[in-house]
């Protein structure tokens, strides 16, 4: 029976995302667990075009974009020390973390 923990990290700022990834990887490596990653996932770019003027001048527009950066970490066959180390990691405020537990039978 092979268990896996998949950790997906999302952020608007790639620097804070890389810092959070380094903290998680170092915490897991201290428990001597096997970790794969960080795997950079494709970033998503959302673009918005809005009128500069509320009334006339349709051709005068402004464009904005939001870039969402993502990383994936996979921990193979985790032990309780890994879960304890992950719960103690303090991450930046702008990083969203999703943890999935996969059990292979």
From Swiss-Prot:
It comes from the Bacteria. GO terms for molecular function: structural constituent of ribosome; tRNA binding. The keyword Ribonucleoprotein applies. Pfam families: Ribosomal_S10. One of its GO terms (cellular component) is ribosome. SMART domains: Ribosomal_S10. GO terms for biological process: translation. Keywords: Ribonucleoprotein, Ribosomal protein. Part of the 30S ribosomal subunit. Belongs to the universal ribosomal protein uS10 family. HAMAP family: Ribosomal_uS10. Involved in the binding of tRNA to the ribosomes. This is Small ribosomal subunit protein uS10. It comes from Rickettsia felis (strain ATCC VR-1525 / URRWXCal2) (Rickettsia azadi).
């Amino acid at each position: 029976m092979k268990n896996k923990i998949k950790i997906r990290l999302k952020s608007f700022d790639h620097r804070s995302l890389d810092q959070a990834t380094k903290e998680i990887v170092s915490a897991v490596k201290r428990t001597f667990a096997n970790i794969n990653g960080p795997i950079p996932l494709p970033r998503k770019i959302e673009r918005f075009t809005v009128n500069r003027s509320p009334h006339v001048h349709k051709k005068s527009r402004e464009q904005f974009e939001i870039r969402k950066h993502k990383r994936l970490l996979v921990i193979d066959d985790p032990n309780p020390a890994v879960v304890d180390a992950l719960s103690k990691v303090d991450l930046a405020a702008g990083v969203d973390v999703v943890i999935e537990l996969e059990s292979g039978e």
